[in-house]
């Protein structure tokens, strides 16, 4: 699970030209849910978000207070594109949790936020909708969170096994293209006796490298 947390002076969500949600001072959270996420990651992320110290205290000391300490608002927006993996220059989202499962998981995430904080201060967008998210970033302050934290899974055999399988899938994907090209290059060519001496060179020059 990934989250981008932004400290804001205000933020809002508009769908179809109509504003459906808005907050004043607080944090805006863009949340990307992975197909590997469980209740454990959910609870960990909720704790991190609500206790993240991105505000100053009464004396002006920076990084001293959380959104709960200040009793500010939280706007949460589901954003599966945070689970993007690039294939060349094209985004691929196969690591994101499937839509129906993700919606239920996201609702559980919101429920946990409201249980852990004041429910009237938690706002959200509209899951699965095309939204315009208006964010007035304060600072700017933007923090990236990940659950589990990068490297934290190395001591967990189950997580390690998942990572190994993901890596194997990536390696197979990368190896598939070159192996086919290699077979093509190594295949014996039939000699065209009617062609000119430059014909073979012309054919090979049309191949993609």
Swiss-Prot record:
Highest taxon listed in the record's lineage: Eukaryota
Sites bearing Phosphoserine, chain numbering: 197, 204-205
GO biological-process terms attached to the record: DNA replication
Motif extent (Gly-cisPro motif, important for rejection of L-amino acids): 139-140
Top-level enzyme category: hydrolase
EC id: 3.1.1.96
Keywords: Cytoplasm, DNA replication, DNA-binding, Hydrolase, Metal-binding, Nucleus, Phosphoprotein, RNA-binding, tRNA-binding
Chief localization: nucleus
PTMs per UniProt: Preferentially phosphorylated in cells arrested early in S phase. Phosphorylation in the C-terminus weakens the interaction with CDC45.
Family per record: Belongs to the DTD family.
Domain notes: A Gly-cisPro motif from one monomer fits into the active site of the other monomer to allow specific chiral rejection of L-amino acids.
Name used for this protein in its record: D-aminoacyl-tRNA deacylase 1
Record organism: Mus musculus
């Amino acid at each position: 699970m990934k989250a981008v947390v932004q400290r804001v002076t205000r933020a809002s969500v508009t769908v179809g030209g109509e504003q459906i949600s808005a907050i004043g001072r607080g944090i805006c959270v863009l949340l990307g849910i992975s197909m590997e996420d469980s209740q454990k990651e959910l609870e960990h992320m909720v704790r991190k978000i609500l206790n993240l110290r991105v505000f100053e205290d009464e004396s002006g000391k920076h990084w001293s207070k959380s959104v709960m300490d200040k009793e500010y608002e939280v706007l949460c927006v589901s954003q599966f594109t945070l689970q993007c993996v690039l294939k060349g220059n094209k985004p691929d989202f196969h690591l994101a949790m499937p839509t129906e499962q993700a919606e239920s998981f996201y609702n559980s995430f919101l429920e946990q936020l409201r249980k852990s904080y004041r429910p009237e201060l938690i706002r959200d967008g509209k899951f699965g909708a095309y939204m315009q998210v208006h964010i007035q970033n304060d600072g700017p302050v933007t923090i990236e969170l990940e659950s589990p934290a990068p490297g934290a899974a190395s001591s967990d055999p189950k997580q390690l096994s998942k990572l190994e399988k993901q890596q194997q899938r990536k390696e197979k994907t990368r190896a598939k293209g070159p192996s086919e090209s290699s077979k093509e290059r190594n295949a014996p060519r039939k000699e065209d006796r009617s062609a000119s001496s430059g014909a073979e060179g012309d054919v090979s020059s049309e191949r993609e490298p």
